A protein has these predicted regions:
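ATP-dependent helicase/translocase motor core
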Residues: 1-178
Length: 178
C-alpha cells in the first residue's frame, strides 16, 4: 500500500510494464544463486535500481540490512546490462515493516541505513540515479558536502565565522540524521 501511495506500480514479474509504468515494484524476484529472493525489485526509467526487504508489521528492522544488501549484490546477469549499479550492486536498498522504513543510498560516500518516513516516488529515485551518473565524483548531496570549497570569510562577525565553520565540519563528518 505504501508503494502504491508513492506512485509505484506493484506487480508480479509476469505483469511488469516497463513501457507504460514509470516505476515498477516487482514482487518476489529470484536473485543470483546464493542471494535469495528479493521481496521487491524496483525499476525506474526501465532500469533496475533497488530492492526492498519487507517484514511483517511491527518487526524491528535492526539487523535486517544484511539481507537486503545481499539482494542488492545478487542481481542476475540477465538484468545487469540495463540496471543502475554502484560498485557492482543496486544502489537503493530498503527495509520495511509497515511501521518503519529504512533506506540506504549506495551513491553516498559512506552509505548507511537511515530511517525514512515514506517511500520515495519513482521520479525521486530516477533523479538521484541520473544525478549520480552525471556527476560520479559527487553523486549525492552528502558527497557534495564533503567537497565543499572553503567559504570566504566575507564580512562575518567572529561568532558567525565559528558557527559556519562548525556547521560545515559537522556536515562533512556526516553528523546529521538526514
Amino acid at each position: 500500500e505504501q508503494l502504491t501511495q508513492a506512485g509505484w506500480h506493484v506487480c508480479d514479474r509476469q505483469d511488469i510494464d516497463l513501457v507504460n509504468q514509470y516505476g515498477n515494484a516487482v514482487r518476489e524476484v529470484i536473485m543470483d544463486a546464493g542471494h535469495g529472493r528479493a521481496d521487491y525489485l524496483l525499476y525506474v526509467d526501465k532500469r533496475a535500481v533497488g530492492v526492498i526487504e519487507a517484514k511483517p508489521s511491527g518487526t524491528t528492522l535492526t539487523g535486517v540490512h544484511w539481507q537486503s544488501a545481499m539482494y542488492a549484490a545478487g542481481l542476475p546477469e540477465a538484468y545487469r546490462a540495463t540496471a543502475v549499479l554502484k560498485d557492482d550492486r543496486l544502489p537503493f536498498i530498503f527495509e520495511a515493516s509497515g511501521t518503519e522504513t529504512h533506506y540506504t543510498n549506495g551513491f553516498d560516500p559512506n552509505p548507511r541505513t537511515r530511517k525514512i518516513f515514506n517511500f520515495p516516488q519513482p521520479e525521486t529515485l530516477a533523479r538521484i540515479a541520473r544525478d549520480a551518473e552525471a556527476n560520479p565524483d559527487a553523486p549525492t548531496w552528502r558527497a557534495r558536502v564533503h567537497n565543499m570549497p572553503p567559504y570566504d570569510n566575507y564580512d562575518l562577525r567572529p561568532a558567525s565565522k565559528v558557527a559556519v565553520g562548525a556547521i560545515e565540519a559537522s556536515l562533512s563528518a556526516q553528523q546529521h540524521s538526514r
